[in-house]
Amino acid sequence: MESTHALQPAEALETMRSQTVLVAGAGVAGRGVISMLCALGARLVLVADDNAQALGHIADDGDTELRLLSVSDAIDTLEELAPQLVVTSPGWKPESPLLARAAELNIPVIGDIAAAWLADQAGAFGQPRTWLAVTGTNGKTTTTAMLTSMLIADGRAALAVGNIGIAPSAALAAQHRGEPRSDVFVAEVSSFQLHWAPMFKPTVGCILNLAEDHLDWHGSYENYCADKAQVLTAEESVLALDDDDVLTTARAREVVARRGYTIHDPEEVASQNTERVVGVRDGRLVEVVIGDPSQTTDLAPAQGISPPGPAGLADAAASAAMARALGVAPGAIEAALAGFKVQAHRGQVVLEHGGVTWIDNSKATNPHAAEAALRGQRNVIWVAGGQLKGAAVDGLIRAIGGALKAVVALGVDRAELVAEVSRQLPDLPVTVIDATDPEEAMRAVARAAHGLAQPGDSVVLAPAAASLDMYTGMSQRGDLFAQYAVAYAGADRADERTQERG
């Protein structure tokens, strides 16, 4: 077996069909891989200490031989098992004992994205699909959904896969069983998934932005950027021209990208190698051929995009640039953006009442995401705090200080956040919520924010921190924010404009 980097589709498919394959992890990704390998008739060893019982019905779909092992048993017997390939769930670190042991035995280790892409490109499920890959520190889900909408509006059989929902391996297996085929996979891919996919080469790839994140997993920011950069091996790379770290990463890898995007005028930011840039001119989203102003294509209005603000506009520009790389018609881009509504917890307006807008951006779980959520806004009552996980907030406060009218802080690391706000913005009103019960805390947040807000203000939940200190996840945090916004803003009348959550 060749090295993981050199693993080719035909070789990988032959291994999946005729050799023993070990699957590490039984989460969403692991279950998707199992269903795909079952469709291929693989000999499987599933390693999982949890959720193994949920997999029994999957093996009934074919003649697959499936053996279940605990992690410790798999480590002890790995040499005896002699798998020719290990497919790991994305969260498993390279130094995990099982994966480290596989490396010692020179067994190739790949992830769920790589396994699905290799099988698909080898023709295991019919004509290979077109893959578009979206990654970045923030904005991946919104951009993936926007891009999928544009492709569908253009008449393409497109499906959003990866972190946004269905695992691509599960989608391949489902279509193998007779469900409608998708010819285009729009994949939201994480740095973890890309680490385990060194051979992955999508048709179109884009890094939306880069900031320090998941350093405990990757070991350094350089490693994190290197894993993200895997999408830039695409046949057509799209560069985020407003993000210096993305451009630095691309230059370090000598990426030649003919396409890019910006939220500014395309001619003002285009790099020397970029030929076509999507950007904003005269209130319109346009695609410009650099150096030839006569070749400007109008795409859509730059106003009214969901989510509002620069972050939403950047996602729309990225989506449009990737769509244009596949030849999507301008009318389809405009129609998709006109009908697009951001998913819950990603800049969703949950209430407009009394001239005050309440915005749920609970997904902003790190300082970079919070900065993106608040950039360009004014008169903001900022709801922030939770688990900072060691992240510094001084740069964030410096960047968004001009947008803030007041701060309501909660969560286990609220003191650190409040201290930095007080140091940089000593005159800014700050309310500290000491409650640790999730409902009580968010009830107090909404009460305080309602008391501070005046017509023309926005109350924005953009925590800059993880949620697990009090909440089951960012979804519960956002749901409770919306619930108590309605309660304290007095929006129980029938004519209130509360947007449907979903």
From Swiss-Prot:
Name the SUPFAM superfamilies for this protein: MurCD N-terminal domain, MurD-like peptide ligases, catalytic domain, MurD-like peptide ligases, peptide-binding domain
GO terms in the biological process aspect are:
cell division; cell wall organization; peptidoglycan biosynthetic process; regulation of cell shape
Q: What does the record give as its pathway?
A: Cell wall biogenesis; peptidoglycan biosynthesis
- UniProt record similarity statement: Belongs to the MurCDEF family.
Sorted keywords for this record are: ATP-binding, Cell cycle, Cell division, Cell shape, Cell wall biogenesis/degradation, Cytoplasm, Ligase, Nucleotide-binding, Peptidoglycan synthesis
Q: What does this protein do?
A: Cell wall formation. Catalyzes the addition of glutamate to the nucleotide precursor UDP-N-acetylmuramoyl-L-alanine (UMA).
* GO molecular function terms attached to this record: ATP binding; tetrahydrofolylpolyglutamate synthase activity; UDP-N-acetylmuramoylalanine-D-glutamate ligase activity
The organism's taxonomy opens as: Bacteria, Bacillati, Actinomycetota, Actinomycetes, Mycobacteriales
The primary location reported for this protein is cytoplasm
Its Enzyme Commission number(s) read 6.3.2.9
Spell out the subcellular localization from the entry.
Answer: Cytoplasm
Designated name of the protein? UDP-N-acetylmuramoylalanine--D-glutamate ligase
A cellular-component GO term for this protein:
cytoplasm
- Annotated binding of ATP, by residue: 136-142
Q: Does the keyword Repeat apply?
A: no
Concerning NCBIfam families, the annotation shows: murD
Q: What chemistry does it catalyse, as a reaction equation?
A: UDP-N-acetyl-alpha-D-muramoyl-L-alanine + D-glutamate + ATP = UDP-N-acetyl-alpha-D-muramoyl-L-alanyl-D-glutamate + ADP + phosphate + H(+)
Which gene is the coding source of this polypeptide chain? murD
Q: Which HAMAP family match?
A: MurD
